[in-house]
């Protein structure tokens, strides 16, 4: 069983989201070099429209609501004065396909089912957490770009212990059938002893 990989970074306010990311996307060989957006719009736009994204309508961005307006989401992040986390949650392609995490709907359902738990790991009151994500089918590793923040900034952070709990929680959910099979096999061996 492989594991879930989570890369996480944050910006102290929405205006700087995409600052370092701008260099990253401008160096990607498959990215349209003519992107001329405000820094705040770069990350959500990149996540929602880059090559490899699986769209759900006009773009690939999804969130807590059924429909996400990309322009409105970008403005919301730009005007946010607190911490904005930019995360990439990734699975190996073979695992994603085998376990059914090869569609945006599967990832949306996973993130929606875990949103209150994720909020608690980041020290965000559940009712104040806001998030957006986009699923990318990149060769070798399928992943979601996950943007989250506290609508009422103050007190949010992610310590190493909670990062590990967050990762373990996603791993246990994604690989639950495989884990059950392993536990059942172990129990069967114990019963034979």
Residue ranges, per PLM feature:
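N-terminal nicking endonuclease/strand-transfer module with a His-rich metal-binding environment
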Residues: 1-193
